[in-house]
């Protein structure tokens, strides 16, 4: 039986976290943003699929950075 590939475990894929509605609302309020102002990630993206993200959800992406130590970005899941 073939092994299933888990995109979230790949060494080149940064950590992705699906935020709850409450977490997303707190984040947007703290940053003074509307959901529509966030960059997009499509619901068909392999990581969004792995997280079972739905359009309207917000994903936090945590990347390791040689200069900043850690870089955090947010994406709005869009139908795609």
UniProtKB/Swiss-Prot annotation:
It catalyses: RNA(n) + a ribonucleoside 5'-triphosphate = RNA(n+1) + diphosphate. Its EC number is 2.7.7.6. GO terms for cellular component: cytoplasm; DNA-directed RNA polymerase complex. Keywords: Cytoplasm, DNA-directed RNA polymerase, Nucleotidyltransferase, Transcription, Transferase. It is found in: Cytoplasm. Signal peptide: none annotated. Its main location: cytoplasm. Disulfide bonds: none annotated. GO terms for biological process: transcription by RNA polymerase II; transcription elongation by RNA polymerase I; tRNA transcription by RNA polymerase III. The keyword Transcription applies. It is an enzyme of class 2 (transferase). DNA-dependent RNA polymerase (RNAP) catalyzes the transcription of DNA into RNA using the four ribonucleoside triphosphates as substrates. Belongs to the archaeal Rpo5/eukaryotic RPB5 RNA polymerase subunit family. Part of the RNA polymerase complex. This is DNA-directed RNA polymerase subunit Rpo5.
